[in-house]
Amino acid sequence: MTNEIKATFDVTTLEGRMKILNAKNAGGASLKTCVDGTIIEAVGIAQYQQESDTYGDMKEETVTAIFTADGDVISAISKTVAEAATEIIDLVKEFNLDTFKVKVSKQKSSKGNEFFSLLLVG
């Protein structure tokens, strides 16, 4: 399992390490509880790897944690969320944004499966 953490904030500071620790240990609310179109006022996003046991099958998954302006954490284990969050992290870092808005997008695949994604909105 890799220990790499990708984030919009400095994960080498005490504040950054505390955010990661709290996200890993408390997890916060699930992104699945957000309705389609929910706008999240974010102050940070981080991604880290965790191992999950799915019916005896260990696999490594990317956890995406969104840190809200009011101090909450919203987390997701989703490939589509992780892909979108990776791009959002890059943009937020490139333009040095302290706060930003993320929109939750809930969609259905061609097979009828529901999936989530994230959009960066102004």
From Swiss-Prot:
Domain of life of the organism encoding this protein: Viruses
Keyword ATP-binding applies: no
Residues forming coiled coils: none
GO terms, molecular function: DNA binding
Keywords: DNA replication, DNA-binding, Early protein, Viral DNA replication
Any GO BP annotation: DNA replication
Function: Single-stranded DNA binding protein required for the elongation during viral DNA replication by strand displacement. Displaced viral DNA strands are transiently coated with the ssDNA-binding protein and therefore protected againt nucleases. The latter is then probably removed by the replisome that performs lagging strand synthesis or during the events that lead up to the recombination process. Has helix-destabilizing activity since it removes secondary structure from the ssDNA in replicative intermediates.
Quaternary state and interactors: Monomer.
Family indicated by similarity: Belongs to the phi29likevirus single-strand-binding protein family.
Protein name: Single-stranded DNA-binding protein
